[in-house]
Amino acid sequence: MKRQKLQETMIPPYETALQEAEKSAATMEKYLHHVRQFVAHDAGRRIDKALVLEYKTRLGNLYAPSSANAALAAVNGFLRFWGFESCCVRPFKVQKKLYCPEEKELSREEYIRLVRAAKEKSSERLALLLETICATGIRVSELPYITVEAAVRGEAVVHCKGKTRTVFLPAALQKKLRRYIQGQKIQSGSVFITRTGKPMNRSNIWREMKALCERANVAPSKVFPHSLRHLFARCFYSIDHDVAKLADILGHSNINTTRIYIITTGAEHRRKMETMRLVI
C-alpha cells in the first residue's frame, strides 16, 4: 500500500470527481463537509487503516449510528478516490426499525393545520409550497423544477442524482399554482422564489416551516420538508400497495429506502397487534 499523509490539497480533486459524477449540490455539500472534518482533525498523519478506525470510533462516540454511517460513507468514497481502498471501514450495524417514533411522524391532520397556519399568516407562498411537496412527494431540493412551464403542462421533469423522472401535478394543485403564478406575475422559471427572484433554498424553507409550529400546534420535531415527502409516501401506499411503483415516483434507486418511508407508527403497530386477539 502506498504511503501518503492526509492533506487538505487532496480535497479539491475529490470535489471535482464528485462534480463529474453528477452528484447533486446537496450530496456534494454533505460529502465534503464530512471529508473536511476528517482531514482537519488528522491532517499530516499517515493514511492507514488504524487512522480510519480511530475516526470511526470517534464518530461512534459522538453520533447515532445512522449519522455516523453517513460520515463514513463520505470518507470511504474519498479514500477510494485516492486509491486507499484497503483503508475503508465497514459501517455501524443499524437494527431495522419496525415502526416510526410518533414524535417524528407528521400526520395528515397536522399537515392540514400547518397549511392553515401558513394561510392565517398570509403566507400564500409557504402554504402552496407545503401542498406542492406533500401532493407530489418531491424532494425539497427538487422544488426549482416546479416551474411556470410545469404548471401549464401539469407535470414537472425533474433531474436529480443523475436520473430524470416525470412528476405529475394533481389537477387541484395545478390550478392553485397557475392562480398563484398569475397573481405574482411570474413570467417563467421557478414558481417558489425569493424577493430577489432566486429559487428558495432549503434553509429558507426550513426556517419558515418551523415558524408555523406554535400556531399550528405541531411539535417542531415533526416539521421538516422531508416529513411532507414521507406523508405523501404513506398516503400513496395506503391506496396502492405497490412499493416498486412508489420507489419510481419518489426517485429511489433502492427499494429498501422506500420501505423506510412507509413504516407505520408504534401506535398503528400496537393497534394491529390488538386486533389479532391472540390472548385468550
Please annotate each region the language model reported.
Residues 1-280:
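Conserved catalytic core of the tyrosine transesterase superfamily
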